[in-house]
Amino acid sequence: IHNNLHGTGTGPVLFTSFSFDPSEDSLLIIPRVVIGQRNGKSWITWIGATPQPALQEFIPNADELTLAWSGSNGDVWQDRVARSVEKIKSGELEKVVLARFVTATSDKAISERRLLSHLADEYPSTWVYSHHGLVGATPELLVRLNRSLVTSRVLAGTIRKTGDDERDLALAGSLARSSKDLEEHEYAVRSVADSLSPLCSSMNVPESPFVLHLSNVMHLATDVTGVLT
């Protein structure tokens, strides 16, 4: 390994992704090429005996892309929400996480690099990822291990931003006081803490969440940390 910088993030980098389903395989990925930037300095890390790759190879295509969207209709979604609420009221369930898909089609190839670049620009405080066509940006951190310190960022409880700073500040305050969102958040934090506790000699679970501001929404967030045994 030849490393002339010796800074955080330089040299080979390993990324991991763990499935919520224990029967599914997890992933360990060492990228062939990493372009990094920190404190005004940029660098490139590549694996192999070949010469340094040309940066032009990684510049996203600037062609315009038109997408057509399709997905489930509002009535179906509202029905699912109503049935989930009834199950919670009856005590059958404590929490439900609903998801719906939207299909985007295009007559041109969709550049993953361009999509990643756009996500990184729009959501600078999130983790952006791409693997075998799975591309996204998430503010939630399942687990991070730094020496013996393990960290998990839990998000639960969300409100949409309006774009008006004064109005959004008031909405952030209402989110932080919402009994419904606080109960939902506590459930998620407890689930993570209970999973990490058997693996740690000590843990820190904050009593109250903070409000994480993204470009389009705000989340209740808690950073659960522990020292591995």
Pin down the residues of each PLM region.
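Cytosolic ligand/metal-binding cores
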Residues: R38-P53, E57-P60, L67-W69, R144-D223, ...
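Active-site pocket-lining segments that scaffold enzyme catalytic pockets across diverse folds
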Residues: I59-L141, E183-A188, V192-S195, L199, ...
